[in-house]
Amino acid sequence: MLLPGHPRPPPAPQSAQNQGLRRQVEPPGQLLRLFYCTVLVCSKETSALTDFSGYLTKLLQNHTAYACDGDYLNLQCPRHSTISVQSAFYGQDYQMCSSQEPISQREDNLTCVASTTLQKVLDECQNQRACHLLVNSRVFGPDLCPGSSKYLLVSFKCQPNELKNKTVCENQELKLHCHESKFLNIYSAAYGRRTQQRDICSSGAELLPPFDCLSYTALQVLSRRCYGKQRCKVLVDNYHFGSPCLPGVKKYLTVAYACVPKNILTAVDPAVANLNPSLKKDDEHGITFNPSGSRVVRKDGVIVSNSLAAFAYIRAHPERAALLFMSSVCIGLLLTLCALVIRVSCTKDFRELRQGREHLVLGSDKAEEDSEEDLEEEDSSDSQFPEELSRFCRTSYPAYSSIEAAELAERIERREQVIQEIWMNSGLDSSLPRNVGHFY
């Protein structure tokens, strides 16, 4: 109780442990701020993952673009990728570029197709990141159908800059192989020979082509044969890929391909999972598929170790992925709070237990000290008694020995006297009869 006029005493200083506990208990506001920052960062990471999954989709899917006469055809691929033309068509159309169908076009059932379309698009757009091509009949050669509306249709892929390339000479076997849980995806292929390209087949003296003779139908052939398979074998010859060059020219097949994880490719093209590796025959190209050379990966459970599979799953199930992510974050925060509360409570209990143990230790130490003092006193008393006894013995033993010696000496003297008297008496008795005898 404070008396009036007396100042209030200053508060007692808090120990370092109490201050540490207060620091441990106070941070809920900081945890909330940390939680908000984590949510923002994770939302940015989720959007980045979504962008990356879209990037992968652009690299795997076939893209189609078209433009009518007088317009520009625009082809573009994302960063670190280039255009790989799959096919090109330039001809007339009644629906895409013309609102009304002329009578002349109705009566003409022939389709006006320019045979140089694919080569022209390849020259302008192949291996470019972006391509802008003016659609005009003069670009693709003579106009076979003057006065009719025509359009340019191009199918292409965006091939990454880092691809697997393989070149096989004529009359040799092409073998493509991917590791487990990955599928083949063919980006480009050409069969023939370029004029300026060195001889990679080492055939010795041979006839050089006067112009580039390449057959790009090899892309369609290999796509049918190897797309979505784990292994692929095909014989490189004119029977399968045609003969684009003059007789005597040594040709070769160049392929650019990639091995794509199973989950990603099936997410982009679900038809890949339904491919049947049974024996097939392609009537168009006369190709017989051999299931021993081309096969689909077994549908057993395979553990995908590639992190890209996670991006494919996030792309296919964005809501579920976001829900799982937020749930994991909330569970982690709850576990952190529980651990913090347990730590604070356990620290308090441990401190009280330590204090009680210290009191017990101090009491036991005092009891041990008292018992040790009592034992020391008893030991000192016990040690004093033998000392006194020994002292008594040391003082009494000489006196006792002298008295006994005197008695013993007295007894010896008495004994000697008795013996002497006996001998004297015995001597007198023996001498009397002898004297008496002489007398008588």
From Swiss-Prot:
GO terms for molecular function: carbohydrate binding; heparin binding. InterPro entries: EVA1_dom, Lectin_gal-bd_dom, Lectin_gal-bd_sf. Ubiquitous. It holds the Pfam family FAM176. Residues 1-13 have a biased composition (Pro residues). GO terms for cellular component: extracellular region; plasma membrane. It is a single-pass membrane protein. Gene3D superfamilies: 2.60.120.740. Residues 49-321 are extracellular. The keyword Glycoprotein applies. This is Protein eva-1 homolog C. It comes from Mus musculus (Mouse).
